[in-house]
Design a protein with these regions (language model features):
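Phosphate- and other anionic-substrate recognition elements at nucleic-acid/protein interfaces
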Residues: 1-244
Length: 244
């Protein structure tokens, strides 16, 4: 029986999730086993640090081709609310209704990943997202009563395991009118590019279209990209890095 993974990126305007079907376990066992110390650049030019070495790049390409997206969604939980700047009760009710509507899918998932919200550090804390994430986590705890265990999944796993550079430079942004401007690259932009790269290599035009349509509707493209990369990072940790 195939395994399914669901990954959530939490937000009141963008409550996104992706469900992936995991490749057969034999697929992971047949891949070259590259020791962890030999996977990423640790020395050399600044822009290469953290990116995968050639041998592991080949493994990553094969790894990310093994899984398959079976569902990608992005819901606006503020529908029907009167004040979008606070967490009205209606937002939580909307979240529960969304989760209930996909209950048969959650029943088939072997892993439930919820992106962990940062509660420390110098960056601004998104307290609304933290509260929503906790309610989402509690929903699955209550629903499955120990038969399934939701995981608070740190964001750094997807960037570290999939080879995001430790230092970002600039990118040339091209506008519709043909004008260009140099912008600072970052992890969010990298994640969106990486997700599109994976889907392009898979030939998954349906999921790419879903992501693009959300972007055109001003829903954040990177939320669904993050969900996809969480599924891929979890697959590396759980199925590739387990003892062969």
């Amino acid at each position: 029986m195939s395994k399914l993974i669901v990954a959530f990126d939490i937000g009141k305007k963008n409550f996104a999730f992706v469900v992936e079907e995991v490749a057969d376990l034999k697929f992971f066992k047949d891949l070259d086993n590259i020791p962890k110390p030999q996977r990423y650049f640790k020395t050399g030019p600044k822009e290469t640090l953290g990116t995968p070495l050639e041998k592991f790049t080949n493994v990553l390409d094969k790894l990310t081709l093994g899984n398959k997206v079976i569902m990608s969604k992005n819901h606006d939980l503020t529908e029907g609310t009167t004040q979008t700047t606070i967490l009205e009760e209606k937002i939580f009710l909307n979240m529960y209704e969304v989760l209930d509507s996909y209950a048969s899918t959650w029943d088939k998932c072997s892993a439930i990943l919820i992106e962990k919200q940062m509660a420390f550090g110098t960056g601004k804390q998104n307290t609304m997202a933290m509260k929503l994430a906790q309610h989402c986590y509690s929903y699955f705890i209550y629903k499955y009563r120990g038969s399934k265990h939701p995981v608070e999944f740190p964001a750094f796993h997807k960037t570290q395991l999939l080879g995001a550079p430790k230092h970002f430079g600039t990118l040339t942004k091209v506008f519709k009118n043909g004008n260009t401007r140099e912008v600072q690259d970052n992890r969010k932009r990298w994640a969106a590019r990486k997700a599109i790269d994976i889907l392009t290599k898979r030939g998954d035009m349906d999921t790419m279209g879903e992501i693009d349509s959300k972007h055109q509707n001003k829903q954040q493209q990177d939320d669904m990209s993050d969900c996809l990369l969480m599924c891929e990072a979890y697959s590396i940790m759980t199925y590739y890095d387990t003892p062969k």
